[in-house]
Amino acid sequence: VNRLGKTRTARLAAVGVACALALTSCSSGSGDSRGDDRATARQASAETTTTSSPTTSTSSSTTTAASGVRIVAVGDIACADGDRTTSTSCRQADTARLTRSLDPAYVLALGDLQYQNGTLAQFRSSYDASWGSLKPITRPLPGNHEYYTRGASGYYRYFDRSAPGYYAWNAGRWRIYNLNSNCDKIDCAAENAWFRRDLDRNPRRCTIVAMHHPRFSSGREHGNNPSVGRFWKVAYNHRVDIALAGHDHDYERFVRLSPGADAQPRRGIQSFVSGAGGKSLYHLGTRKRGSAVFKASVPGVLVLQLKRGSYTWKFRTVDGRTPDSGSRDCL
């Protein structure tokens, strides 16, 4: 190749990188113990983490080559219109205000977005009044409360999406899978086969899998969900980096775990429960193996900064604090 050819090649490569950072594309698809064990402690020490630090400023840059792509991930959000607001319930307007101040590129909405029954009228009267301005950047998935309306029709109509509700999309260099974990309502065997195929087609990428029901949770109301183990096994075998869920109304971070809850710092999936989106807050139940941080006193959202080969996380609360934060490299 001559000098001119090399120059043109370099310019095309630069353009390709810029486009990859700027664009997103989607594809659709029809043993517990209390406290942390020593393996958990060793893994936690390998992470860069900070807890209980106040936050005084927010960067307005959502997507740059240096900072990556900023995503807010949260579920369990809006009370029915007219329900009484307290310090710990019906705070959807406050979590929406916090999210707008964070200026994310995307909102990953983790299900149970509109209580009690997820009807279209409820979505329009409550969720839309608080989180509606964020709808253009929202990438939702359904929770169990969406199915309190037959076929989750209110959810699908409000977000202009189609059943069965699982799909993949790109955020910068990351691949993100929004799954439907309501396996009593859809064919999760077919979904899992689609999930496996798409992971096979996208090797060596930093990856997130998101669903409403968490594989692991210390929340008293629900706790662990073995039913989503099928998704975790596929994710683990393909070296998925992060698992996100809601369902329990709290914030919880786990160290990297196998589908069987073994701490695996160099191989496991790091999971977060981010269900403190406004509806209400639950209490701590039995602390599950691998649980590193549990917070359930103030509503808030999980903020992820997805970079090339790494990520950072922050749990931001509506009172302006950051009770948990840290960073990790991808697997």
Predicted region positions:
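Bacterial N-terminal signal peptides that target proteins for export
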Residues: N2-A14
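C-terminal motif of bacterial Sec signal peptides marking the signal peptidase cleavage site
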Residues: L23-S25
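Bacterial signal peptide processing site
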Residues: S27-S30
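Extracellular mucin-like PTS domains
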Residues: A41, S45-T64
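N-terminal active-site segment of His-dependent metallophosphoesterases
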Residues: T63-Q122, K185, A190, R197, ...
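Residue-level marker for buried hydrophobic side chains located in beta-strands
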Residues: I71-A73, V107-A109, P140-L141, V209, ...
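Active-site glycine-centered loops adjacent to acidic/histidine catalytic or metal-binding residues
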Residues: D76, G111-D112, G143-N144, L179, ...
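Extended active-site neighborhood of metal-dependent phosphoesterases/phosphodiesterases
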Residues: G82-T86, Y115-T207, H222-I242, D250-K307
